Amino acid sequence: MSDILDKIIAVKREEIAQAIKRKPLAVVREDAESRVLTRDFVGALRAKISAGKPAVIAEVKKASPSKGVLRADFIPADIAQSYAEHGAACLSVLTDRQFFQGSVDYLKQARASCALPVLRKDFMVDAYQVYEARVMGADCILLIVACLDDAQMKALEALAFSLDMAVLVEVHDEAELERALKLRTPLVGINNRNLKTFEVSLDNTLSLLGKVPADRLLVTESGISTPADVKRLREARVNAFLVGEAFMRAEDPGVALAQLFGLD
């Protein structure tokens, strides 16, 4: 595991400990189990692909550790609405505060402003966070293979499924992909960022593509910023994309989405 992930996970453990003091696990579990129906995250992606369109998970992201603030004029509801109007299949909302300046409130605001299913983008290491995700309205959670052992992944996936949430499992290399494929979720995200060097290359997705079984839905993540990138990936039969930074820097994120994917 990289140093940055070690640091992030330590912070998450402390955040969870503090959250449990404010709201005990039994309470958050009861809240999660009493929530209304989720939106179909996997179904939304498959519907776009069946229609011959790219399935875009559009990210609502204020900042990143490496780039700082991406968007000063940051209004999650407006961003989400624009994404929905311009062809996004789903949303991804950062809820990590310390490293990405995210917020639970951002997810709530984004989800309330449109009908799209929403991924809680955070570093999930504990069951408490899964219950929390359901309470805030998430329809899907992210499990990062680099942050978890196999038993943890399996347990968190089972809990998410029991709460009617989808799971996107994220990998960075072939060894992580092999571990991810032990899970039941159809959603496999390949992150194009090298966790050791932080360099980004679409070759990461293209090199692992053939090792993803046909019954899984591959989502390529990071480094997709030009129509040429999209063309290259779509020609390789990659149909689902998670994109944030390229949109966050644009005047209108939804318009930028339509332009990048040829949906305008």
From Swiss-Prot:
Keywords for the protein's UniProt record, in alphabetical order: Amino-acid biosynthesis, Aromatic amino acid biosynthesis, Decarboxylase, Lyase, Tryptophan biosynthesis
Species: Polaromonas sp. (strain JS666 / ATCC BAA-500)
UniProt protein name: Indole-3-glycerol phosphate synthase
Annotated HAMAP family: IGPS_B (MF_00134_B)
NCBIfam families the UniProt entry points to: PRK00278.1-2 (NF001370), PRK00278.1-6 (NF001373), PRK00278.2-4 (NF001377)
EC number: 4.1.1.48
Homology family: Belongs to the TrpC family.
Substrates-to-products reaction catalysed: 1-(2-carboxyphenylamino)-1-deoxy-D-ribulose 5-phosphate + H(+) = (1S,2R)-1-C-(indol-3-yl)glycerol 3-phosphate + CO2 + H2O
